[in-house]
Regions:
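Bacterial N-terminal signal peptides that target proteins for export
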Residues: 1-11
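N-terminal signal peptide c-region/cleavage motif recognized by signal peptidases
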Residues: 15-16
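Hydrophobic ligand-binding cavity/cleft-lining segments
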Residues: 20-78, 94
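Short, low-complexity Ser/Thr-rich regulatory SLiMs
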Residues: 30, 74, 104-106, 130-136
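Short, surface-exposed coil-to-beta transition loops
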Residues: 36-38, 95-101, 123-129
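Glycine-rich portal/gate segments that line the openings of hydrophobic small-molecule binding cavities
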Residues: 42, 71-120, 172-183
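Sec-exported extracytoplasmic/periplasmic mature domains
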Residues: 52-65, 166, 170-182
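Beta-strand/loop substructures that line and gate deep hydrophobic ligand-binding cavities in soluble
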Residues: 117-164, 168
Length: 183
């Protein structure tokens, strides 16, 4: 899943960033085969709307058009679900459909934790965490993820491209969530 804090370089390349919530920070660290992502964004939407949007696992495509499909595979008890999603990821002219299967835990009304299921998708391992904080009528979303892809990522430009893609996707997602808040 794509995780997240960041530097918005190339605003000219991603004009949707200016229309969406504000990206406060982002970073990507590459260590061997493992990536560590972090991003914080401020959404002009109430915490309850943001939480509902990011936990509607059967309808994630509604908040990000890069998500081609998402579904709950099974409920694993109170606040735990196994979720499968397919994301179309394009970097430059290369596109790939990435499958991820995660065991998702709704920790409380503002925290979600997802653990990749090894062998069930295109990742060897991964752990993601979403933390929401109300800031007046807005919400800060802090997303972190550590993952090891099961596919090749170019080592020299990979971290830079992943950060660019992450920032763009978070910006697109905030735009959709803010649109839902305005309805």
């Amino acid at each position: 899943m794509i995780r997240v804090r960041g530097i918005f370089i190339g605003l000219a390349l991603f004009p949707c960033v200016l229309l969406a919530g504000k990206i406060l920070e982002s970073s990507v660290i590459h260590d061997g085969a493992v990536y560590r992502l972090s991003i914080t964004a401020r959404l002009e939407a109430p915490l309850a709307v943001v939480y509902q949007s990011i936990t509607d696992f059967s309808n994630l495509a509604a908040i990000n058009p890069s998500i081609e499909e998402s579904q709950v595979l099974e409920s694993q008890g109170s606040g735990r679900q196994r979720v499968r999603s397919v994301v179309r990821v394009c970097i430059l002219v290369f596109c790939k459909r990435v499958v991820q299967v995660q065991d998702v835990t709704l920790v409380n009304y503002r925290t979600v934790v997802a653990t990749m299921v090894p062998g069930a998708g295109d990742f060897r391992a991964g752990l993601a965490r979403w933390e929401l904080t109300a800031v007046g009528t807005a919400t800060d979303l802090h997303f972190t993820e550590t993952f090891e892809p099961g596919f090749w990522v170019p080592p020299i430009i990979g971290p830079w491209l992943i950060e660019k893609k992450l920032v763009r996707e978070v910006a697109r997602t905030t735009l959709y969530i803010e649109g839902q808040a305005g309805e």
